[in-house]
Amino acid sequence: MLELRHIEKIYNRGTVNEQCIFKDFNLSVNDGDFVSVIGSNGSGKTSLLNIICGSIDIDSGAVLINGDDITHKNEYLRHRSIGRVYQDPSKGTCPSMNIIENMSIADNKGKSYNMRRGINRSRINFYREILRDLNLGLEDKTDIPVGALSGGQRQALSLVMATMNPLKFLILDEHTAALDPKTAETIMKLTDKIVREKGVTTIMVTHNLKYAIEYGNRILMMHEGHVILDKEDVEKASTSIDDILDLFNQISLEYGN
């Protein structure tokens, strides 16, 4: 279980640009949950992910995984058990290296590893089998620099690399936002397949209401650092895009934005 307890985060404290993102923010995510997080710009969605991953520090509160306090644990140590896929496909891969080299680095995350020793040849067939399952033809492009792939191919590779090793959480930071609609659908289907097969607890930030409704067992809507909608299972299944849009419109009227 992931727990965020009494989180406070203020950007630019003591300046004219001071902004309080979270004040006494609390959230629990159960093992195996697939949570879709939606909300307007500036609502705290990405800050939430950054706090979980250790990319930014909090001013007070605690972050716990299965009861262990990881509040002050370095980001690189958290990433041994957390996989993250970003909106920009280039952030999850090394563009100058080929597919096999990228997968080998991901395969050895958290281990003592040196590329000069070469890639374990016994793993190459394993990597190709993973690529073949994607149905994107990448198994025939293993020697091509990743930077030469399409955005969708790179994002699919990023998703595979993020989940190659056993992990506790998968963090998806608007990972389909930069893709065309057809490619985004392909990536979402792949995402759902991987999440189901691995049973990994997943938090997905998205602006696509269709995906937020269609995928996962829980949906959160955030506004100004607060969760204003939290539905799961049957309640989520009965929620429509129109319901979400009505809430967005209500917020716009109440807060004038």
Task: For the regions a language model picked out, list residue spans one by one.
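ABC ATPase C-loop
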Residues: 162-163
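A short, flexible loop at the N-terminus of ABC-type nucleotide-binding domains that lies
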Residues: 1, 10-24, 74
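H-loop/switch region of ABC-family ATPase nucleotide-binding domains
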Residues: 206-207
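The feature captures the beta-strand-to-loop junction immediately N-terminal to the Walker
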Residues: 38-40
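Helix-to-loop junction immediately C-terminal to a conserved catalytic motif
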Residues: 53
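ABC ATPase NBD coupling module
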Residues: 69-83, 91, 113-114, 120, ...
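Conserved ABC transporter NBD signature motif
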Residues: 61-69, 229-231
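Conserved beta-strand-loop-alpha-helix hinge in the C-terminal portion
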Residues: 226-250
